[in-house]
A protein has these predicted regions:
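The beta1-alpha1 cofactor-binding region of Rossmann-like NAD(H)/NADP(H)-dependent oxidoreductases
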Residues: 53-65, 97
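Glycine-rich phosphate-binding loop signature in dinucleotide/nucleotide-binding domains
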Residues: 69-75
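Conserved mid-core segment of classical short-chain dehydrogenase/reductases
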Residues: 63, 86-97
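Conserved glycine-rich Rossmann-like NAD(P)H-binding loop of the short-chain dehydrogenase/reductase
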Residues: 23-39
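Hydrophobic/aromatic anchor residues within beta-strands of the central parallel beta-sheet
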Residues: 49-51
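Rossmann-fold scaffold of SDR-type NAD(P)-dependent oxidoreductases
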Residues: 6, 76-84
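Conserved glycine-rich cofactor-binding loop
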Residues: 7-11
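Aromatic pocket-lining residues of Rossmann-like dinucleotide-binding sites
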Residues: 20
Length: 97
């Protein structure tokens, strides 16, 4: 299966990436700032998997990521949107008094 996985360089996304790679899937592994963990994961890859950088808060970078993924994978069979973006907020705004 061909999979696009966002937020794959750490945490839950990295665990998902490791498991999918172990099962032999072809992966497009998104990261924003931490490529080194994915380099180690993909070092001996034989499926054609690759990493791709994008800041998901920037619409043009998301478009570029999708185009590059389609160029390399054709169309993915599965997209796992693990990454998220958040704006900073004062935590007291979320507290009920």
């Amino acid at each position: 299966m061909k999979v696009l996985l966002t937020g794959s360089s750490k945490g839950i996304g990295y665990k998902i990436a490791k498991d999918l790679k172990a099962e032999g899937h072809m992966l497009a592994l998104h990261y924003n700032k931490n490529e080194s963990t994915l380099e180690a994961l993909l070092k001996e890859d034989k499926t054609g998997s690759f990493s791709i950088q994008a800041d998901l808060s920037q619409q043009e970078e998301v478009k570029k990521m999708v185009v590059n993924t389609i160029d390399k994978l054709s169309f993915p069979d599965c997209i796992i949107n693990n990454a998220g973006i958040a704006e900073s907020a004062n935590i007291s705004l979320a507290v009920s008094y």
